[in-house]
C-alpha cells in the first residue's frame, strides 16, 4: 500500500528543480513547512536521503535523489495522462495545465488570458512560468510546461507552433522625442537616434534585423531584459525602443507618457501563438486552451491585440 501521494512527489520534484524549499514553495504555491514535511515523509518512506542540506547553498540532490526524481517525474506525467484520458472519455476539461509565456509580453497578456480561461474551465489547475525564448524551447522538451505563448522566433522543428494573431512592430518614444509627432516612422528615420534595446534571446535579433536589412547599425544606448524597465527608460528620454505588443495605457510604469508609432516599410510582423510538443493537444485541457485563445482572437478580445489592429 502506498504511503506517499502525488502531491508529495510534485513537491519533491519542485525542490529538485529549484534547489531551494522556499523557491519550490513559491513555484507550487504552498508554504515552506508543507514542502519540508513532504520531503521528510518521502525520505522516511523510501529509506533514502534525497537531498544534501547545505545551509549556504540550499539543497542538492543525492545520487539516489536524482534517480528518484527522474522516476517521480515519470509517475507525475503518467498521472496527468490518466487525468487526460478520463477527460477525453467523459468529454470534460479538468486537471493541471502548465503554461509558459514569453517574458517580453507576459505582463500584458498572460494574467487576463489565464483569468478568462480558469473562469471558463474552473476544474483546470493552471500554473504559469515566464521565460525567454530559449528557456521556452528547453522547458517544453523537458515536459515542464504543456504549452507556451510566444512568438514565431527561430522555432525548432521538433515543436509545433499554432499561430493565433499577427502583431506588426511599433516604435515607443517619449512625448518629447523628436519623432513623437509623426503618424508613422521608417527604420531609416530611427537610425540616427539612441535605442533602448529589449535584449532577450531571439527577440533582440529580430529587432536588429530591421537595421541589417538597410545596412545600418543602430545606436544602442541602453540594453535591458525587462519590458517595464525598457518603457521607463524610453519615457525618461534615454532613447526609443521597438516592441510588438502594446499596453492599453500609454504610459511607463513610473507614470510618464509614451507614444506608440507604427513602423512602415519592409519589416516582418511577429506572429504570436502557442508552442507545444507535436502531440500535446491530444490532452483535453491543452486542446481547450488552444480553442479558447482562438476564440479570443476571433472576438477581438486577445490581450495585446490592439497593436496589431
Feature roles, as predicted:
Residues 57, 63, 87-106, 120-124, ...:
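Interdomain hinge and pocket-entrance segments immediately C-terminal to HTH DNA-binding domains
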Residues 132-137, 141-145, 150-151, 202-261:
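Hydrophobic hinge/microswitch elements
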Residues 194-214, 249, 282-292, 299-305:
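Secondary-structure junction motif
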Residues 43-61:
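A short LG(V/I)-centered, amphipathic sequence patch enriched
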Residues 94-157, 224:
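Central regulatory/effector-binding core of bacterial HTH transcription factors
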Residues 13-31:
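Short helix-boundary/capping micro-motifs
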Residues 157-167, 182, 189, 228-278, ...:
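Beta-alpha-beta core module
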Residues 45-46, 68-90:
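Alpha-helical linker/hinge and terminal dimerization helices associated
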Amino acid at each position: 500500500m502506498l504511503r506517499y501521494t502525488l502531491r508529495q512527489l510534485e513537491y519533491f520534484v519542485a525542490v529538485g528543480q529549484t534547489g531551494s524549499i522556499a523557491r519550490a514553495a513559491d513555484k507550487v504555491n504552498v508554504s515552506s513547512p508543507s514542502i519540508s514535511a513532504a520531503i521528510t515523509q518521502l525520505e522516511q518512506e523510501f529509506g533514502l536521503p534525497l537531498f544534501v542540506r547545505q545551509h549556504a547553498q540550499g539543497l542538492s540532490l543525492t545520487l539516489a535523489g536524482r534517480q528518484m526524481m527522474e522516476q517521480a517525474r515519470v509517475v507525475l506525467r503518467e498521472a496527468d495522462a490518466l487525468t487526460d484520458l478520463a477527460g477525453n472519455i467523459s468529454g470534460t476539461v479538468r486537471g493541471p495545465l502548465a503554461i509558459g509565456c514569453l517574458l517580453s509580453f507576459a505582463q500584458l497578456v498572460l494574467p487576463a488570458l489565464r483569468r478568462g480561461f480558469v473562469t471558463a474551465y474552473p476544474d483546470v489547475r493552471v500554473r504559469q512560468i515566464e521565460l525567454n525564448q530559449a528557456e521556452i524551447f528547453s522547458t517544453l522538451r523537458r515536459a515542464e510546461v504543456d504549452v507556451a505563448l510566444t512568438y514565431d522566433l527561430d522555432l525548432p522543428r521538433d515543436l509545433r507552433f499554432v499561430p493565433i494573431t499577427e502583431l506588426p512592430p511599433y516604435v515607443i518614444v517619449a512625448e518629447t522625442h523628436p519623432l513623437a509627432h509623426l503618424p508613422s516612422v521608417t527604420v531609416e528615420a530611427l537610425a540616427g537616434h539612441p535605442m533602448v534595446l529589449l535584449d532577450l534571446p531571439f527577440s533582440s535579433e529580430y529587432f536588429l534585423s530591421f537595421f541589417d536589412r538597410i545596412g545600418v547599425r543602430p545606436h544602442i544606448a541602453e540594453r535591458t531584459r525587462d519590458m517595464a524597465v525598457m518603457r521607463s527608460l524610453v519615457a525618461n528620454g534615454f532613447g526609443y525602443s521597438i516592441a510588438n505588443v502594446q499596453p492599453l495605457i500609454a504610459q511607463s510604469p513610473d507614470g510618464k507618457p509614451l507614444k506608440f508609432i507604427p513602423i512602415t516599410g519592409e519589416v516582418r510582423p511577429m506572429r504570436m501563438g502557442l508552442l507545444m510538443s507535436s502531440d500535446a493537444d491530444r490532452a483535453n485541457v491543452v486542446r481547450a486552451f488552444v480553442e479558447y485563445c482562438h476564440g479570443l482572437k476571433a472576438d477581438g478580445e486577445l490581450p495585446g491585440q490592439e497593436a496589431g489592429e
